Structure formats: structure tokens, C-alpha cells
Amino acid sequence: MTNKNYLSSGLVAAATLWVSTFHVAAVSLAGEFAGKTPLQWSVGMADSQMARLGDRLAWTEGGSAKWDYTAGLFTLSLLKLDERVHQPRHLQFVTNAIGSFIPADGKIQGYKAGEYQLDAINPGKTVLALWQITKEDRYQKAAALLRRQLDTQPRTRDGGFWHKQRYTNQMWLDGLYMAAPFSAEYAGLFHEPAASLDDVAKQIHLMDEHSYDAKSGLFYHGWDAKQTQTWADKTTGCSSNFWGRAIGWYAMSLVDTLDYFPTNHPARAQIIATLQKLAKGVLQHQDQATGLWWQVMDQGGRPGNYLEATASAMFVYSLAKGVNHHYLPYEYVPVIQKAYQGIVQHFVKTNAAGQLALTQCCQVAGLGFTSNGGRPRDGSFDYYVSEPIVENDLKGVGPFILAGLELQKLVEAQAAPPTTKRKLH
């Protein structure tokens, strides 16, 4: 299949409380940003990225196709977009891309279970969606294969998943996004015992317990249970800086995992409280001039630091979804609006053919070993700002599409009748 045939041109601190509800008109929520609605921006970015990728199934320019967490993020964003606009090209792209890895027996091409990478779980969200759409057995088999990895995933002494086999005794914020929503959704679809959801909640709680810094209101990128890694504090085990995208991953994990937690689950309130705590910290570190967020979040305009697109898009998505689901109060809407306007104004550019591009994306960052440039990934400020800055990284494109969808819901809520009170779940 050739894809181009389908292409077109600190506000709350408890888990449950009552807040006065602002009628949407009470906050000036723009319906358009730089002349387009959020939905139009999402469609434009999706179609532009599909055109760039074509049918090569390679997620980076000049690269080769592989089972990859960024592929999972981008294809999931296309499916969420398809739910809204119902354009065949989006579903066809996803089916071609993810489906090409999965033969009839459900054994995923390029997937290596023995590496125990939480990153490899992330495309499973798209697999579950395709199974629900198509009911093809291969997708159910592939999802079960990914789920079985978590049964034997190495764990820290208190039960937290290692991020990868080679990252011994380490939990990273990233890993919560990769595995928690998938595991929670799988548990519901296939009627797993209550212990499955309990374990998802435990992973979220452990990351909160070990990586949260009360002074800044932010979360450290990683935690070493043994305090032996070169990047780890010898007392706390935490890495030394607050990387924007890592916190963005964690934010998205919270709002997405909540989709699959019943309202009567005892851990649901705790997850919402963690989201509220995170949102307060994110708000405190928003750049006041642009509405965006920095690569190293608490370092502002320090030389070398820069306003970064992937984290900013993740925060807009997470905050907007939090408001839409009443986990966060409506007072966050001006924050969300300012941030989205900042992304469109400062990060999105349009070429002569009308294609959109997302600039100022940190290409990659991690902890331990060395970067592609040979620099130790030591968690320092200098390390985080040394990684390449690229355009159209799927870790930014996917969240930008999702952010537009959630903000569009907020825009449309302007027509909703006012109520006197609203309860945060």
C-alpha cells in the first residue's frame, strides 16, 4: 500500500473536593489559534507526518523499521484522531504500519521479550485498539505476548518494574507511560484478576514515592533502588535534574491509565491526587513569556537551556485531558491555552506546500551508558542540553495531535450549560 494515495492537503491537593465551576465563557478560551482550530492543527500535523513517512515504516529519516515506542505513540494518536474525523487514511496508515509487524501467529517481528524493555510494551496500546476494531486473532495474540512480558519483568526490592533488563534496579518516569495504560486496559478487556490493576497502581505509586521532590514540585527522571549508578544520589537514588519530557511521560501515564480504572477502585483517588500534585508543579515552572516549558524544567533561561516542544505538547495534552475528565479544575484552562498558543507560535512552521513541522524537539535522553555522541548520560544539566534538537520527532508529533484533540473538547465545552458545582473525581 502507498500511503500517499490517502493523504490530504497547586490548585488542588486532595483527590476529592468541591470547587466552584466556572462557566466556560468566564475564561476567554480561544476557538482558534493562529487561524486554525486545535482539531485542524491536529489533522494538519498528522497528515504532514504521514506524508513524510510514506509507506517506509521507518520512524526516523534514513532509519529502518522496528518495533518502537515512538511508533506506538504516533499510531495511537492517529487512531484517536480517527475517532474524531473518521478519515480512512489514518486507520489505513496504522493498520499498514503496526499490522506489518504482526503475522497470523501473533509473534511480533523484531520484538525481543528477553530484553525486558518497557518501551517495547507501548505499541501494545495500538495493538489492543486494532484488535477491538478488527477482531483479528493476530492482534489479540500479540497483545497477550506483550502482557506476558510483565509477568516476569525484573523488579526492584519493593516491586517496581526495572526499566529494562540492562538498567538493573532502575525505575524511570518514562516506563510508566510505556506499560501502565496498556496493562490497565488489557486487564479490563480480558477480565484479569483485581491484582493486575492493583499492580498498575503500585507502579505509579512507587514512582511518585521515590522520584517526587517536594521543594520544586517536580519529579526526577530516574530512581536507582541500589544507589550504585553514577547518575544516582547516594542517599535517595534519584537522578539529579528534572527533565521535561520525562515528567511529560509520567503526566500522560496518569491521565491515560485513569481511563481504565473503575471509579470504585481504591487506588483511583491516589492516582488523581498524584496528577493534581504533578499539575501544580508543572504550572509553577511554566515560562511566563511564552507559556512553554524548558528542557531542564527548573533552570529557566540558564545558558544552554531551551524551550522544548515534546514536553510542552505532553503537558498540554495531560492538563487538558485532566480538565475534560474533571480531575483538574477549570482554572487550568488559561495555562493550557497559553501553552498551546506558544507551541503553535514558536514551534510549528508551515512549508510552501502547506505541510506542518514541529521544531525544537529533544531527540533523545536517558540515564547511564553514553550518548550517540559519546557523552556520559550522567543526568547532569550539561548532558540534557547536549542531546540533538530535531524536527518532527514522533515523541512530539504524537502528543501535539493528542493535545489538539483534548483542547478541541475544551473549546466545544463553551456551549455547555453552566452548573453550580463540579466534583473532582
Segments (PLM) and residue ranges:
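Inter-helical turn/loop segments and adjacent helix faces that build the functional surface
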Residues: 186-197, 257-269, 322-330
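Bacterial N-terminal signal peptides
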Residues: 10-23
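CBM-like carbohydrate-recognition segments
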Residues: 31-72, 84-91, 100-118, 122-124, ...
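Long, well-ordered core segments of solenoidal/helical folds
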Residues: 38-58, 92-110, 141-160, 194, ...
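Extracytoplasmic mature domains of secreted/periplasmic and thylakoid-lumen proteins
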Residues: 113, 117-178
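Acidic/His metal-coordination segments adjacent to aromatic residues that form catalytic metal sites
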Residues: 54-56, 102-109, 160-165, 227-240, ...
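Oxyanion-binding "anion nests"
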Residues: 251-300
